[in-house]
């Protein structure tokens, strides 16, 4: 594996066809419910000193879940993402420096439902490589855990023998394939 190095600042744009933003949350205390957003917009700037800065957004309406349409509608509604009022989820990072092995810790602000909170994501920066068509590509894979209640997502139902139908800790999974501008 090589780490991303540059001789001058470079901007990389997310390849929408090869990038994803997913989430997973405990369901009925025994399984994980997973979903993703298909419309991911990301930009990564690699500074001369190797510092990495990420800005990104996803369109909430692009949510995809392996569930009935009424559940998708519930997720898009006011109990969860409130897509009509808040159509985007955004993230803006502070500069971060990858380690020699490509591992990286990214600190930034995540905004959902009009609420911004600091988030720390960990992951890996891979590349660069030249693709068969002459473009320079890299990848950024990140994971973070948030408490959905901090973003106003408090909906839940109690289970008959204790516990809640939906967990509060949500794992965010970001996979960005990046193309140099």
Where are these regions (language model features)?
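Low-complexity, acidic/polar, glycine-enriched regions of mature
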Residues: 1-181
């Amino acid at each position: 594996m090589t780490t991303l190095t540059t001789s001058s600042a470079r901007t990389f744009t997310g390849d929408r066809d090869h990038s994803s933003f997913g989430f997973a949350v405990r369901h009925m205390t025994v399984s994980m419910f997973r979903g993703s957003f298909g419309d991911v917009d990301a930009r990564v700037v690699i500074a001369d000193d190797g510092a990495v800065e990420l800005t990104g957004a996803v369109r909430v309406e692009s949510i995809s879940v392996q569930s009935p349409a009424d559940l998708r509608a519930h997720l898009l509604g006011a109990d969860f993402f409130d897509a009509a009022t808040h159509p985007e989820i955004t993230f803006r990072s502070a500069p971060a420096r990858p380690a020699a092995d490509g591992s990286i810790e990214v600190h930034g602000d995540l905004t959902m439902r009009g609420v911004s909170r600091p988030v720390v994501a960990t992951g890996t920066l891979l590349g660069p490589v030249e693709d068969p068509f002459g473009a320079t590509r890299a990848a950024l894979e990140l994971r973070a855990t948030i408490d959905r209640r901090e973003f106003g997502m408090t909906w839940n139902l109690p289970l008959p023998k204790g516990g809640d139908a939906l967990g509060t800790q949500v794992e965010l999974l970001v996979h960005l394939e990046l193309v140099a501008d």
